[in-house]
Amino acid sequence: MSANHMTPGEIVSELDKFIIGQNRAKRAVAVALRNRWRRQQVAEPLRHEIHPKNILMIGPTGVGKTEIARRLAKLANAPFIKIEATKFTEVGYVGRDVDTIIRDLTEYSIKQTRELEMRRVRSHAEDAAEDRILDALVPPPRGASGEPERGEDNSARQTFRKRLREGKIDDLEIEIEIAQPMPQMDVMTPPGMEEMAEQLRGMFAGLARDKKKSKKIKVREAFKLIVEEEAAKRVNEDDLRAAAITNVEQNGIVFLDEIDKIAARQETGGADVSRQGVQRDLLPLVEGTTVNTRYGMVRTDHILFIASGAFHLARPSDLIPELQGRFPIRVELDSLSAEDFVNILSETDASLIKQYTALLGTEDVKLEFTDDGIRRLAELAFSVNERTENIGARRLYTVMEKLLEELSFDASANSGEVITIDAAYVDLQLAETAGSQDLARYVL
């Protein structure tokens, strides 16, 4: 089910499968997504006046800001882009300008819409691919116009069709005409000239379009290539572009990470002009403007912007007032406790424990984590965070990697064994490293 049709409670329940705690942030993004659906039910002209309420997430690193955005993207099945605010420079300076955010979002939407359309016409494309392969195996008689006249009463053709569907002639080589793939042009351009590079790539790709070449390949490979070619023929490019642009305008989500890095403190100098310039350039995008892309004009009035930052050295109030006003919903994310680490390791759907168990299971090594082992692992990770840099849940990656380092290296030698990871095993592998502040700082 698409998140656009889910209630806020259902969206939060889905996010709970992957993210521990942070209920305020989950509720905020769930309501924002549900408001998308609500707006679509409102009649015009009022619908056009209802704008999304952008969200600012504030919290230390590793507490789930990016993960909430990543999971939301999968759940929403909408055009989504995550970008670092620090990658952009003020218009007029060397570097990328903020309009490329919308261009990249539109590119993603085009790709997403094309995949959807290709799936829709796939069954017809497969039928056409079958016929073209059978034409190569059993050439049909040609009519007065020179076109092949396919008749299903041909017993040889029917026999080959049956064998083709059963996969019995997959390794048979046939000679067939297929469209040449578009050349991959690598156009080197200075920063900020990405649009020109895209136009040049499109021009060179257009030169090779519709050119066909006779190739001798196996039936299995030919079928895949012809299905793609036939599906592309059945997709109307103009309709696809219009649908993709509408999808961006009505359902697009932009996640602006590290926005605190472009917030200038009053007492600092130097790069402040450029930072404030990026903020000023973001203003029209967030408020609503029209951006020119290679597929047409895109309005940003109803695109949802979610910004996030740790705000260690700066405060949200250090953003220019106009930009502060464009993010009316602010949610603070909590620092993670040792108990949260236990839940992250044991309760999430794709926990690190499940990942490592599956990875080593491919070499017939069975890992069994006990409750006291999980708790000890969480306590050590939390302790290292407290004594060194606090990187939140990301500390679990480094601790888990160190814990299973020897086991991963010698996995093939331990094939068929059951390894129990309890508190004693965790202490044996990690206690010395975690206990020494110097070692913990550089190893964990």
Curated annotation (Swiss-Prot):
Assembly and oligomerization: A double ring-shaped homohexamer of HslV is capped on each side by a ring-shaped HslU homohexamer. The assembly of the HslU/HslV complex is dependent on binding of ATP.
Location (main, coarse): cytoplasm
Any GO MF annotation of the entry: proteasome-activating activity
Residues annotated as binding ATP: 20, 62-67, 257, 322, 394
KW ATP-binding (keyword) present: yes
Keyword Transmembrane helix: no
Alphabetical list of SMART domains matching this protein: AAA, ClpB_D2-small
Name of the molecule in the record: ATP-dependent protease ATPase subunit HslU
Keyword annotations of the record: ATP-binding, Chaperone, Cytoplasm, Nucleotide-binding
InterPro entries, per the entry: AAA+_ATPase, ATP-dep_Clp_protease_ClpX, ATPase_AAA_core, Clp_ATPase_C, HslU, P-loop_NTPase
Source organism superkingdom: Bacteria
Cellular component annotations (GO), alphabetically ordered: HslUV protease complex
Organism listed in the record: Bordetella bronchiseptica (strain ATCC BAA-588 / NCTC 13252 / RB50)
Function, in words: ATPase subunit of a proteasome-like degradation complex; this subunit has chaperone activity. The binding of ATP and its subsequent hydrolysis by HslU are essential for unfolding of protein substrates subsequently hydrolyzed by HslV. HslU recognizes the N-terminal part of its protein substrates and unfolds these before they are guided to HslV for hydrolysis.
PANTHER family, per the entry: ATP-DEPENDENT CLP PROTEASE ATP-BINDING SUBUNIT CLPX-LIKE, MITOCHONDRIAL-RELATED, ATP-DEPENDENT PROTEASE ATPASE SUBUNIT HSLU
GO BP annotations listed: protein unfolding; proteolysis involved in protein catabolic process
Record family assignment: Belongs to the ClpX chaperone family. HslU subfamily.
HAMAP family xref list: HslU
